Design a protein with these regions (language model features):
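Bacterial N-terminal signal peptides that target proteins for export
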Residues: 1-9
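Hydrophobic helical h-region of N-terminal Sec-dependent signal peptides
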Residues: 10-15
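N-terminal signal peptide c-region/cleavage motif recognized by signal peptidases
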Residues: 17-19
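N-terminal secretory/targeting leader peptides
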Residues: 23-115, 124-127, 131-329
Length: 329
């Protein structure tokens, strides 16, 4: 009888252990991009790889921008558990702390995506982002980027002087201040409203996304003077989730998420870069589109204007000062 009871006890323990190991997790993330956008497709491919890598134990439902909350409300939604996570431009939360704007797009800091990734993964950026996010109830998993973004304009732009008086859509934070310092008039709009705003003349130009996506979305039909390669922006796109839900994940699933985001980042940059090269050839063959390429001197002039704003932003909060010191050390 004692032997039978002991066997039953061992079996129960094994069953309990197995059920813990086999526990499934289902998460809901909201993207900053609309469905049908190339960025969104790349993000969806990442969620599919996560499910495959985890043997089906971790599933992520990815929703397009605006599905649950507005694009600039996802940080609160994730922190409060309304969403489990988000994939978004960090600069949208500059109103919470100017540090978000500085780390999101320190114009002039990165010449290529790999430089940003080195900073995030090995240069203190990961720790900085989590120090910024954790008070809001988020865990920063990792970063991706679109690479150097294109710039769409209804007016010819061949240098910094042409920015004067230009009504330009730009994200909140440092990038708006840089454009203002260059003489432009920044306008705060979500990406989903850029086409209509250009078409109706609400804005003259837009810091939008990469050249190929702008072209696919029809922006070059209403803004026939794009600047490419971009001179202005390489956004830090964060993949973050609710801190409590992150802590509830087993360590192997945490590692799958962390490593998979690094792969996702390389995937995004490579795919979008290839798309840009193909689309550039199409655009230059279109007689209705004039692609402008700024000289090295004009690009350097814009970078100097941008870097002058770093210290001003750094003075606005302790966190911003920490970001500034890490960037410049």
């Amino acid at each position: 009888m004692k032997v039978t009871f002991f066997k039953m006890f061992i079996a129960a323990c094994m069953l309990s252990s197995t059920s813990v190991v086999a526990q499934d997790f289902e998460l809901t993330f909201q993207s900053v991009d609309p469905a049908g956008n190339p960025n969104f497709a790349i993000q969806q491919a990442w969620t599919e790889r996560v499910k495959l890598m985890s043997g089906g134990r971790l599933s992520i439902e990815l929703l397009p921008v605006g599905s649950v909350v507005e694009y600039n409300e996802t940080q609160d939604a994730v922190g409060n558990g309304i969403l489990d996570g988000h994939i978004t431009d960090v600069s949208y939360f500059s109103g919470k702390d100017p540090a978000f704007g500085l780390i999101a797009n320190p114009i002039g800091a990165w010449a290529a995506p790999d430089e940003m990734f080195r900073f995030i993964n090995y240069g203190g950026g990961y720790e900085l982002m989590n120090a910024l996010e954790e008070p809001y109830g988020l865990h920063f998993i990792g970063a991706t980027t679109t690479g150097l973004e294109g710039f769409v304009s209804k007016r010819p732009l061949d240098g910094v002087d042409d920015l004067k008086g230009l009504k330009v859509r730009a994200p909140e934070g440092l990038i708006q201040e840089v454009f203002a310092a260059a003489g432009a008039v920044p306008v705060n709009l979500p990406y989903s409203e850029v086409y209509t705003a250009l078409d109706k003349g609400v804005i003259d130009a837009a810091d939008s996304t990469v050249f190929s996506t702008n072209h696919q979305q029809g922006l070059h039909k209403v803004a026939e003077h794009p600047v490419y390669p971009g001179f202005h922006s390489m956004p830090l796109v964060e993949v973050s989730m609710n801190l409590d839900k992150w802590n509830a994940l087993p360590s192997d699933l945490q590692e799958i998420l962390t490593v998979s985001v690094r792969d996702f980042a390389q995937d995004a940059v490579a795919i979008l870069s290839m798309n840009d090269l193909k689309t550039y050839a199409e655009a230059t063959a279109d007689p209705n589109i004039t692609v402008h390429n700024w000289s090295a001197e004009e690009r350097a002039k814009f970078r100097r204007i941008a870097m002058d704003q770093w210290a001003k932003v750094a003075a606005r909060s302790d966190n911003a000062q920490n970001v500034y010191e890490t960037l410049t050390s």
